[in-house]
Every structure is written in structure tokens, then in C-alpha cells.
């Protein structure tokens, strides 16, 4: 069962105007996520990148700014319309499509990288999503993601404090039963022939002038974590050595 994500339709028109605190928090998460992904990919220029669950386009535009050819997919028609309009106003040529992770509207083996943030803990069928990830990635492609760990601490911080007490997020955004342990994620990806690199913690590191959280890497993966996986023809898991994507060497992001 998929989470109730009607908030992304309700607030789509406010995606870029800074009026909604939870959207500002999503925007503030882009720099640390991208800083980590940069260490894996190196140069984005010339790569075809799928932003899976793109929402109103925060990550898509950041990737386009780095020179990637970006395809953004999201189930919210309202968010896609906002993303397309904003990209055009900024001069970005980003292809946006309405679609779900369980049935990605992208051709087989057509993308160099998939970026999937704030998504995996919401989808209806995680196994189907990973089947689709495997299908659309090129043989030397890389899957970059983040999600929320299924721990009591994550449920306390994200749901009880974040949604109920401090109301940083709309209530009902997250179902802690859908949070994903790193060990579970690793097993699912390996079943699909993907080697998995080390996981990296992600969380609040301070405040900005609007007293919104800013984010960065953390030593613990007990709440949120980032990771990457890639097609491994030899069936070997990540071991801390470099891996190849589109002819370039990727550096593992072990802390």
C-alpha cells in the first residue's frame, strides 16, 4: 500500500515559492544529497539521469545545472506541471513524465544514473520498483538513493517529533512500517544483480536564517541514510574499490 501523498498535489503550486516549511526542508536536503552523489558519479555532464519521484523538480534542476540530461518522473500530475513550468522559466530542458516507480515510463537500459530520493519509503511495491530500476539502467549504470531506516529512533524523530509534535511535515506523510532497514535494501538490490556500496547517514546539521534545518552527512544510519548500487557482472558486492559508470571511475563514499 502506498502512503497518502496528496500533500504533493495540494501544495504543488507552492513548490518553489518558499511558503511551506516542509518544502523548504526538501529543498535544503538537495545540497547534501547531491554532494554525496557527486562523489560517486564525478562529472554528470553528458549523462542521462532519471530523477525517480522528482516532485516539483528540486533535484532535477540541480542535476540539469550540472550538465546532465534529465528525465523526471512523478505520480503527481500537479507536481509535474509545476516542475515543467519552472524548468522552462529557468531555461532548463528537462523531460518530465507522469509515472510510478513500479512502472517507469522509460525505455529498457536507457539511463546512466537513477537518482531516487524521498521515495523508497513511500512506494506501494518496493520489489517492483527495484525490478524497474534494473530494467531501465544501462549495463554500466548506477542507482543513487536515500531512505529512512526502520528503527524506533527513526519513527520517533520522523513521525512523532517531525509530524506530530513540531509539525515540520504534514501528518500522515510517513508510515514507519514502510521504513527500510539497510540489510533489507542490500538483499533486494543484490537479488537483482546490483552490487551495493557502503551506506552513509544523513540528517540535520544546523539551522539557516529562517530557522529551518540544514542537512549533511552523519556517522549514524539509524534515521536516514544514502547509498548507491551498480550493475555487477561478476556478482560481487561493493568492497570499497572504485566501480565504473559510463567509462568513468566512481569513488565509493565510505566515510
What is each model feature region?
Residues 14-15, 151-154, 203-206:
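Feature marks short, surface-exposed loop/turn motifs that line or immediately flank catalytic pockets
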Residues 29, 90, 96, 165, ...:
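A C-terminal cap/extension of S-adenosyl-L-methionine-dependent methyltransferases
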Residues 18-37:
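Conserved SAM-binding loop and adjacent beta-strand
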Residues 154-164:
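Short, flexible, mixed-charge acidic loops at enzyme active sites
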Amino acid at each position: 500500500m502506498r502512503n497518502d501523498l496528496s500533500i504533493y498535489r495540494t501544495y504543488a503550486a507552492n513548490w518553489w515559492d518558499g511558503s511551506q516549511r516542509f518544502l523548504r526542508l526538501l529543498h535544503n536536503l538537495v545540497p547534501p544529497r547531491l554532494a554525496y552523489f557527486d562523489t560517486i558519479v564525478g562529472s554528470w555532464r553528458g549523462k542521462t539521469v532519471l530523477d525517480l519521484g522528482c516532485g516539483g523538480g528540486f533535484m532535477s534542476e540541480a542535476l540539469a545545472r550540472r550538465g546532465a540530461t534529465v528525465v523526471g518522473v512523478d505520480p503527481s500530475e500537479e507536481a509535474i506541471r509545476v516542475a515543467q513550468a519552472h524548468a522552462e522559466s529557468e531555461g532548463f530542458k528537462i523531460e518530465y513524465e507522469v509515472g510510478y516507480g513500479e512502472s517507469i515510463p522509460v525505455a529498457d537500459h536507457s539511463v546512466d544514473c537513477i537518482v531516487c530520493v524521498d521515495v523508497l519509503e513511500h512506494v506501494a511495491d518496493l520489489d517492483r520498483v527495484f525490478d524497474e530500476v534494473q530494467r531501465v539502467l544501462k549495463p554500466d549504470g548506477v542507482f543513487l538513493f536515500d531512505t529512512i531506516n526502520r528503527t524506533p529512533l527513526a519513527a520517533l524523530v520522523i513521525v512523532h517529533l517531525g509530524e506530530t509534535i513540531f509539525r515540520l511535515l504534514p501528518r500522515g506523510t510517513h508510515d514507519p512500517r514502510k521504513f527500510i532497514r539497510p540489510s533489507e535494501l542490500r538483499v533486494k538490490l543484490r537479488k537483482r544483480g546490483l552490487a551495493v556500496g557502503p551506506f552513509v547517514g544523513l540528517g540535520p546539521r544546523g539551522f539557516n536564517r529562517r530557522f529551518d534545518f540544514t542537512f549533511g552527512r552523519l556517522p549514524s544510519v539509524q534515521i536516514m541514510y544514502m547509498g548507491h548500487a551498480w550493475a555487477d557482472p561478476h556478482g560481487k558486492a561493493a568492497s570499497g574499490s572504485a566501480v565504473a559508470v559510463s567509462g568513468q571511475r566512481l569513488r565509493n563514499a565510505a566515510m
